[in-house]
Structure formats: C-alpha cells, structure tokens
Amino acid sequence: QLPHVADSLLLDQTEKIQKFIRIINRELDRRKKLLSEHGVGTIALYREVTGKQEPTMVILMDSYESMKDEPYETDLFKLFMRISREGLSIGVHLIITASRQNNLRAQLYSNFKHQLTLPQNDISEVRGIVGATPLASTMEDIKGRALMKRDEVDVVQFALPVAGDNDIQIINNLRDQ
C-alpha cells in the first residue's frame, strides 16, 4: 500500500526471492552500462550530464540472520556483496538489520560505509559498531535514539510521522495513513 515500495518478500517465498535476485542483478548491470555509455562514474554525474533522473533504489533486508540456511542464502549474499561494493556509485543503497553485529559476515560488514546501532543490552555490541566512543556508554534508551558511525559518531533521532500516546495508537494511526 505504500507508493514508494515496489515489493516486499517473505522468507518462505523462495521463487520470488530468486526472481528478485535476477532482477536486481540485471538492474545493476543496466545502470553500470548506462554510466559507461555516458563516460561517467557515478549516478550524480550521469544526472548532471544527461539531465535525466535515474531513480535511487533502496533495498532493505530486515533480520539478516533469518535467511541463514535458506536455499537462496548464497545467491542473496552474493547480491548483497555486489550492492555493498558497487551500489553507492550507481544509486542503489542497501540497508541491513541484524540482532547482533557478528550475525553479519565480516566480508559484507566491512563494505558498509555507515553503521547504526540502537541501544543494546550488551554495551560491547554498541562498541563493536561505533568504536570506543564515550557516546557508546552514555547512550540514552529513548525510542528512536541511535548512534550512527560515519566519519565520526553522531547521536541521531528517528521519529514516526504520526502521533499517538502509546504503541497501539501509533500503529493504528500509521495504518490509517
């Protein structure tokens, strides 16, 4: 129902996920070829040179560890590796969530330019993501509060675009939008 969401996939939709992998690989190839044909190295330069707006794509994988032992795990991992290496320059971004940092393969995690952590029960999990910054141990447990590691570590606040006095009201208000 969200106009900016092309599709959503569930873990048990093996055929749909395999089709998604093929489609995204083709899209990555198409975008790389497009940039090459115009002699530019990034989607921003392509837009500047051609005046055309190639849309930005964001792919979200919630709970990375949940795909472990699924028949498509290897192919999906290869796709995520490719996006993490090539995606930024061609306008394809990858967001992956995991309950613990060590649930992500280091090979993939090392390609992430930005990392974000919400409050964790184990402070070492926070430090593993953002480093030994004092912010890691003083992070307030406020809904939507997070630490984001870019060049430096910043405190960020996320908010839902709806009002509500409790979680149920917020969820219902989100559904009504």
What is the meaning of each model-derived region?
Residues S124-R150:
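Phosphate/diphosphate-binding loops
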Residues K68-E70, F77-K78, H114, K143-Q177:
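Conserved P-loop NTPase motor module
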Residues Q1-G41, G51-S124, S137-T138, Q177:
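P-loop NTPase catalytic phosphate-binding loop
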Residues L45-R47:
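Long, structured protein-protein interaction/assembly regions in large complexes
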